[in-house]
């Protein structure tokens, strides 16, 4: 097994295991929006936000406190947008502090440069909010167009 040393110190390193160094896991991780080459910070945030907004809507709509009322879908929409807003504020706070260059590891040897600056993280946060809100609205509209009441009766 290979040991990837951190700053020349073998005590602080990353052990190459079959999980983190296999071609399948490397291909998967390198194709995630955070590590994909050629994307701007705004586009990275947009893709990550869309995924988060889309999957946050369902639990709030089906399992939220308004689950047995006619306002469950609207409550899920507003709750998920509020959660996306809170996450965007957290990303903006992270962008406001001194951000160092991300550490290169065995699975992510080519970390994008824009994730190492405050401006890049600010653009990521902006894209995250737009994408997250869009993902929530898309999930809401998708559930309104389909037979959401039938699904809710089956699950509830």
UniProtKB/Swiss-Prot annotation:
UniProt keyword annotation of rRNA processing present: no
- What family does this chain come from, according to its entry? Belongs to the PsaL family.
| Protein's cellular compartments | Cellular thylakoid membrane
Q: Which Gene3D superfamilies match?
A: Photosystem I PsaL, reaction centre subunit XI
Q: What is this protein called?
A: Photosystem I reaction center subunit XI
Annotated transmembrane regions = 75-95, 128-148
Q: Could you confirm whether the keyword Cell cycle appears in this record?
A: no
Gene Ontology BP term (one): photosynthesis
Q: Which InterPro entries match?
A: PSI_PsaL, PSI_PsaL_sf, PSI_suXI
Pfam families with a match to the protein in the record: PsaL
């Amino acid at each position: 097994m290979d040991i990837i040393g951190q700053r020349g110190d073998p005590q602080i390193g990353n052990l190459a295991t079959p999980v983190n160094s296999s071609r399948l896991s490397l291909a998967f991780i390198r194709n995630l929006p955070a590590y994909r080459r050629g994307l701007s910070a705004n586009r990275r945030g947009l893709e990550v936000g869309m995924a988060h907004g889309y999957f946050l809507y369902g639990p709030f709509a089906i399992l939220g406190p308004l689950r047995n009322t006619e306002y469950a879908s609207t409550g899920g929409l507003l709750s998920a947008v509020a959660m996306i807003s809170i996450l965007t504020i957290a990303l903006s706070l992270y962008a406001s502090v001194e951000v160092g260059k991300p550490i290169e590891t065995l699975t992510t040897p080519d970390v994008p440069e824009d994730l190492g600056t405050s401006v890049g993280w600010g653009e990521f946060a902006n894209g995250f909010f737009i994408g997250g809100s869009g993902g929530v609205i898309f999930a809401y509209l998708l559930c309104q167009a389909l037979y959401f009441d039938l699904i809710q009766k089956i699950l509830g």
